[in-house]
A protein has these predicted regions:
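Class I S-adenosyl-L-methionine-dependent methyltransferase catalytic core
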Residues: 1-192
Length: 192
């Protein structure tokens, strides 16, 4: 099985909604989601090279669960790699999303490691200011910054929505070029 020095993941976190209005905007109304236990059960650690960096997109309500996920996958939390401050689609104003307490307009990508990976560029910045696109799509700039930070190493994107050059991909919206070693679920199926 191919091993990767960079794993980039944007799991389809399931959320509890508190109103009918929120149900129409939730992730579940856009794509299949997964509960935390199913995300934790994915054998992501088996894809990791001896020295590997994990970049994991999370939303603030899932922060504690995300830390459980990276531990279950065999990684140790290091820092927040990126803070995506979202701008509206049509102008440069800040996007105002939903939120359980305050109106959310940022998401974070945490960085975790297995072994002792080394960064190659100390000038990569944390804040990404960019426009939102389709629901939950992350800015392409994040991938570019990951390669600048860690180098042109074997890399895979999990839960991918596109197939960027230089990346192996796994997800239910792409033709998979990477495979998770699972007996019960075929590649790219989230129906665990």
């Amino acid at each position: 099985m191919k091993k990767y020095s960079i794993i980039y993941a944007d799991p389809p976190w399931a959320y509890r909604t508190y109103s009918k209005k929120g149900q129409g905007r939730s992730a579940e109304s856009h794509y299949p989601t997964m509960c935390i236990e199913d995300i934790k059960a994915l054998p992501v650690g088996e894809l990791a090279a001896k020295d590997c960096t994990l970049f994991l997109w999370i939303t603030f309500p899932c922060l504690c669960e995300a830390l459980e996920v990276l531990t279950a996958w065999g990684f140790s939390y290091k820092t927040v790699a990126f803070v995506w401050v979202k701008q509206n689609r049509r102008n440069d104003d800040l996007f105002t999303g939903m939120g359980y307490w305050t109106r959310a307009n940022a998401e974070i990508c945490i960085l975790a490691t297995k072994g002792h990976p080394k960064r190659v560029d100390a000038g990569v910045r944390q804040v990404i200011l960019s426009h939102i696109e389709e629901h939950s799509k992350k800015p392409d700039e994040a991938r570019e910054r990951i390669v600048r930070l860690m180098g042109d190493l074997p890399r895979v994107e999990l839960f991918a929505r596109q197939s960027p050059e230089g990346w192996d991909v796994w997800g239910n919206e792409v033709e998979c070029t990477a495979h998770l070693p699972m007996e019960e679920t075929p590649c790219c199926g989230y129906g665990l």
